[in-house]
């Protein structure tokens, strides 16, 4: 699916019956969350709330509420096509030596396609049609959702945060939630291992005492948003990747108050800085964030994060505010995980050819549990795969549980996975525990915030060297009998 910006994407979704306009007044305070949650659980359409209570700007919700719409956002027509994207990323991440002239030509064509998708910088852009500065900057003028009864304040959820480290050649794009704490202030909740936090940390060391510029794009086109949550190789910018998905170069414009480049077609852009504050150990302004209901289905504990002061807000004429909520699965992050799972598979297989399939169950809060199907070749092989998954992509840094099974187990069928665990696992021999590893700050089950343990479960058939006992043989009916019963089944009248 090809589109130019978020508005074009919305228009095409509506024509396909994948978006519904809501003309009834609906409050951003709790009501939108309940409506979007019910719609997502029913695999319903994206929703455009045209009359948010007390606001003039419409709200777009449930945009990525089905894997199919995620695929459409990534320029595909079906979820199955996402593996092609994974193959492209795998080639870029770990290119093998070309095997012949055809491979050389194919690789050259891919490189040219990526080069042709280098971002295009504009002198003016729709996102600068309207500019709020000074006292006009007031977040209360935006229909920011208050998602759950126990949330401390309204929360910006789909903001595309744009940062740049002092020694980095390109910008980083990330999705980080932002708590509203004032007319022009939000708390930027980014984990220490994420790109935005790393950029800021580098700035605070190299340029301590100087304000750190940030831009937040709300309502960027889907390819750019999804590029920020996809394992794009370091050699490729998210803007280039978005252009590759979209089939057209990503158009950027220089922010009005910094050297950062923002998506030209973004609906709303927040520009500002994290300002120095020598009273804080970091040397920069911080505040206590939370609690908020999150993708685990619980309210998280409070913690300190940097304060982003918004100096100006720019927007398109008649802007659209893109929002979401996070809660007990399924929610949009869980749906994204299901779709991006297809992108991850070729990447993993490129590095570990023994991996046959890979699955992130949506009930596992997007990434906390993974099930791997492998072609086992030697004793201890499953353990190697576990550590490979944990270390290969940053997306799996926080995966707490990995279950590894043989090729005869359908990893997308929990009945088969549970059967493999209960019949092929000895709890002492086949579980691997690793302590003091990075864990999501939102994971309150870990003993220390941001640091906890991981478990690997080897549910494969055991080889000599792993057991001294005669291993069980699975029960299967002969093909001849199955064929015979198929032939007489209708006559049996069962």
Swiss-Prot record:
Binding-site residues, Mn(2+): 172, 238
GO molecular function list: 3-octaprenyl-4-hydroxybenzoate carboxy-lyase activity; metal ion binding
SUPFAM superfamilies according to UniProt: FMN-binding split barrel, UbiD C-terminal domain-like
Entry membrane topology: Peripheral membrane protein
Superkingdom of this protein's organism: Bacteria
A family per Pfam: UbiD
Cofactor note: Binds 1 prenylated FMN per subunit.
GO terms classed as biological process: ubiquinone biosynthetic process
Pathway: Cofactor biosynthesis; ubiquinone biosynthesis
Known EC number: 4.1.1.98
Binding site for prenylated FMN: 175-177, 189-191, 194-195
Gene Ontology terms: cellular component: cytosol; plasma membrane
Catalytic activity field: a 4-hydroxy-3-(all-trans-polyprenyl)benzoate + H(+) = a 2-(all-trans-polyprenyl)phenol + CO2
Listed cofactors: prenylated FMN; Mn(2+)
Locations listed in the record: Cell membrane
InterPro entries per record: UbiD, UbiD-like_C, UbiD-like_N, UbiD_bacteria, UbiD_Rift_dom
Top enzyme class: lyase
PANTHER family from the UniProt entry: 3-OCTAPRENYL-4-HYDROXYBENZOATE CARBOXY-LYASE-RELATED (PTHR30108), FERULIC ACID DECARBOXYLASE 1 (PTHR30108:SF17)
Record-stated family: Belongs to the UbiD family.
Complex and partners: Homohexamer.
The protein's name: 3-octaprenyl-4-hydroxybenzoate carboxy-lyase
Gene name per UniProt: ubiD
